[in-house]
Design a protein with these regions (language model features):
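Phosphate-binding glycine-rich loop
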Residues: 1-13
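Short beta->alpha connector loops at strand-helix junctions that form conserved
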Residues: 18, 37-42
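Active-site pre-lysine segment of PLP-dependent enzymes
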Residues: 29, 47-56, 69-92, 98-127
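A short helix-loop-beta submotif of the ANL/AMP-binding
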Residues: 30-35
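Short beta-strands and strand-loop turn motifs
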Residues: 37-38, 60-66, 92-96, 204-206
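PLP-dependent aminotransferase class I/II
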Residues: 119-196, 200-203
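Conserved PLP-binding catalytic core of the aspartate aminotransferase-like
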Residues: 195-224
Length: 224
């Protein structure tokens, strides 16, 4: 919300993936920007398609990696290529909400990839693996100039003291983090295998949810 308020004006363009997190388009439209959708390849964000949608009016590119609701991701080589191919005046926002679940060699979190870039914002949240969605708390990384712009428009007291305290405790609890990752891997595989047995198509995922296609399912919801 703050990013859109700070950097968008009427008739600016924002590029998002076809099946991206809905909040990007909501806040972009609230700030009178035009949302441009880049087609995905097999429910995976396509860097080439995103770049094809960029125009002189483009101000922000949002990308969740891994993506919600598809559960897919783009590798570190591709997301770095995206930043390098974008104009320097285009802000790239990398949503790392599910990064704690990722343990793949070709994946890297946005914070490590873009720590030296001045035109990237990386966002993180305590709502997913930490289970603190009700506290509405997260954090972000960006250059000093971007952070200053966000601070100038943020409402006062937008994060409560209990939320801050809980987040500070949670981020140090590595035992909980590792337990949740093991739990996710066990049950995501079980769900994936079960859906395959039921002939229900779903993509493989590295996060804590599955995207399910019921188009070809010839069973009632009770049977499923």
């Amino acid at each position: 919300e703050l990013i859109c308020k700070a950097f968008l004006k009427k008739n600016d363009e924002v590029v998002v993936s076809q099946y991206s997190f809905i909040i990007y388009r909501i806040y972009s439209k609230l700030n009178q920007a035009k949302v441009i959708y880049a087609p995905e390849n097999n429910f995976t964000s396509s860097v080439d398609n995103i770049l094809l949608k960029v125009t002189r009016k483009t101000k922000i590119v949002f990308i969740a990696n891994p993506n919600n609701p598809t559960g897919t991701y783009i590798n570190k080589k591709e997301i770095l290529r995206l930043r390098k191919k974008l104009r320097s005046d285009i802000l790239l926002v990398v949503d790392d909400a599910y990064f704690e679940y990722m343990n793949l060699k070709d994946y890297e979190c946005g914070l490590k990839l873009f720590s030296k870039y001045k035109n990237v914002v990386v966002t993180r949240t305590f709502s997913k693996i930490y289970g603190l969605a009700g506290l509405r708390i997260g954090w972000g990384y960006a250059s000093k100039n971007i952070i200053n712009s966000l601070y100038r428009i943020k409402p006062p007291f937008n994060v409560s003291r209990p939320a801050l305290f809980t987040a500070a405790v949670a981020i140090k609890d590595l035992a909980w983090l590792n337990k949740e990752v093991r739990h996710m891997k066990k049950w995501s595989k079980k769900f994936y295998d079960t859906f395959r047995e039921l002939n229900i198509h779903t993509n493989k995922t590295s996060v804590n949810f599955l995207l399910i296609n019921f188009d070809r399912v010839k069973k009632t919801s009770k049977q499923v």
